[in-house]
């Protein structure tokens, strides 16, 4: 395994201790710091223990190994994203669909930093997680699945308001496009040094779904 290409960016402020209580939050923050700078493949339990200020055997009393620790990190992060997004998604209003979607898009700024400290973390998530079936299941169970279910509940309400009839297959296909645009915009906003265009993305989402506000 080659680790020469691992990132050496400086991690940002503690993240998990803001919402995960006790020692678990401290361990997850230590793991995040190591994985952000070394990558998942190159980061070690020994380095995480050193970051935390404990011995490696002490860390193993909390987690069976690096995979279990990383899976818990993914799950905790996913749960927090869903918790923060749920209120916004559940409040989406078909009668004000563009404004509601714009609020959903812009809400990310409250919770996602837009600076270089985010890049190594996102690189870690999108390189290590997709190659591991267990990690993919964690992401589905804690992030993708709950988000999809909430949006799946909104789409029929919006469709009914605008007089759109879709088959179950069409709804699933539309939901995938909708999520691809939303998630892709958020991720590229964190990874690329390009200006935001919330208005344009909201317009594109409305157009893709066929929710013409003038129809109301």
What is each of the regions a protein language model found here?
Residues 113-141, 187, 191:
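Amphipathic alpha-helical segments used for helix-helix packing
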Residues 15, 136-137, 141, 145, ...:
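Hydrophobic/aromatic-rich alpha-helical bundle segments in the mid-to-C-terminal region
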Residues 72, 85-120, 168-175, 202:
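Hydrophobic alpha-helical connector segments
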Residues 26, 30-76:
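Helix-turn-helix
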Residues 1-22, 216:
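N-terminal intrinsically disordered/low-complexity leader segments
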Residues 30, 34, 107, 181-188:
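Amphipathic alpha-helical interface segments
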Residues 104-108, 122-126, 178-182, 205, ...:
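Short alpha-helical scaffolding segments that buttress acidic/His motifs in well-ordered protein cores
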Residues 20, 28, 74, 78, ...:
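Amphipathic, non-transmembrane alpha-helical scaffold segments
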């Amino acid at each position: 395994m080659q680790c020469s290409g691992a990132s050496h960016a400086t991690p940002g402020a503690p993240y998990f201790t803001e919402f995960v209580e006790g020692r678990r939050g401290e361990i997850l923050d230590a793991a995040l710091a190591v994985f952000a700078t070394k990558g998942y493949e190159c980061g070690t339990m020994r380095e995480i223990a050193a970051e935390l200020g404990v011995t490696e055997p002490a860390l193993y009393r909390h987690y069976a190994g690096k995979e279990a620790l990383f899976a818990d990190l993914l799950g905790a992060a996913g749960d927090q994203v869903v918790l923060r997004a749920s209120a916004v998604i559940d409040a989406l209003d078909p009668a004000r669909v563009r404004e509601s979607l714009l609020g959903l898009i812009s809400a990310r700024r409250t919770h996602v930093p837009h600076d270089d400290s985010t890049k190594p973390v996102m690189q870690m998530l999108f390189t290590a997680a997709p190659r591991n079936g267990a990690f993919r299941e964690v992401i589905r169970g804690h992030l993708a699945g709950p988000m999809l279910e909430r949006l799946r509940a909104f789409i029929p309400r919006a469709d009914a308001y605008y007089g759109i009839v879709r088959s179950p297959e069409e709804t699933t296909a539309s939901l995938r496009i909708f999520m691809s645009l939303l998630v892709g915009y958020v991720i590229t906003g964190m990874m690329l040094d390009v200006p935001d265009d919330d208005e344009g993305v909201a317009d594109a989402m409305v157009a893709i779904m066929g929710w013409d506000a003038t129809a109301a």
